Amino acid sequence: MVPWLGPDDPFPSVERALGAASGAPGLLAASADLLPSRLIDAYRRGIFPWYSDGQPVLWWSPDPRMILVPAEFRISATFRKTLKRVLREPRWEIRVDCDFAGVMRACAQAPRRGQRGTWITAEIIDAYSSLHRAGDAHSIETWLDGRRVGGLYGVSFGRMFFGESMYAHASDASKIALAALVAHLREHRVEMIDCQQNTSHLASLGGREIARKTFVAHVRRAVAEPPIPWRFDKRVVAGLLGQAASATAADAFDR
């Protein structure tokens, strides 16, 4: 039985989330509210909301957990050429927090294979916009010829980034934003991006699954660190093109 959380009820232990044999593996709790304080508490515990319009707020903590270690980000030969062009041509820009709400709306409207509608509801946009105004949620945006053509958004506490969604209106535009995020996080010694659930696209870029207990233990440590700055210079992306992945960082989490 999934517990119902009242406004003052704490989250149960993530170990109580439904298991693989259930119809909803990883489902931990449900509630009527999506208050910013609840959202902040959730992320700090390795929990995230995911639900559709008309449903209660559903809170999840799956096991295993999909992550991307910045040092393990994979760049194909073709995408390497794309990044070099982005660095070389002024018509390409990478902006941070220029249009956070616009990125969220674009992610909500992006078609997803096998998915009808969107989980990025008006309530979700309002809640994450509140986190953004507080400096806890950020957008990385790809701009071409003065037009936003792709991007992603997520939540950041300490030295931990929790990815939420991405979209592209031009070829590789979301991947460019992800590469910029990876470069920025590497620059500031962030060791893990939470990707929540496994997808073949994330796996092709270096994402992998780790045990929930390993993930939660890392989150607990990382969110206690001082926050990283969110000023960005696209030249940091050059570091991705000339540096091999760090074996030390790559081996820091159980496979």
UniProtKB/Swiss-Prot annotation:
Its EC number is 2.3.2.6. It catalyses: N-terminal L-lysyl-[protein] + L-leucyl-tRNA(Leu) = N-terminal L-leucyl-L-lysyl-[protein] + tRNA(Leu) + H(+); N-terminal L-arginyl-[protein] + L-leucyl-tRNA(Leu) = N-terminal L-leucyl-L-arginyl-[protein] + tRNA(Leu) + H(+); L-phenylalanyl-tRNA(Phe) + an N-terminal L-alpha-aminoacyl-[protein] = an N-terminal L-phenylalanyl-L-alpha-aminoacyl-[protein] + tRNA(Phe). Keywords: Acyltransferase, Cytoplasm, Transferase. GO terms for biological process: protein catabolic process. It comes from the Bacteria. GO terms for cellular component: cytoplasm. GO terms for molecular function: leucyl-tRNA--protein transferase activity. Pfam families: Leu_Phe_trans. SUPFAM superfamilies: Acyl-CoA N-acyltransferases (Nat). It is found in: Cytoplasm. InterPro entries: Acyl_CoA_acyltransferase (IPR016181), Leu/Phe-tRNA_Trfase (IPR004616), Leu/Phe-tRNA_Trfase_C (IPR042203), Leu/Phe-tRNA_Trfase_N (IPR042221). Belongs to the L/F-transferase family. Functions in the N-end rule pathway of protein degradation where it conjugates Leu, Phe and, less efficiently, Met from aminoacyl-tRNAs to the N-termini of proteins containing an N-terminal arginine or lysine. NCBIfam families: aat (TIGR00667). This is Leucyl/phenylalanyl-tRNA--protein transferase. It comes from Burkholderia pseudomallei (strain K96243). The gene is aat.
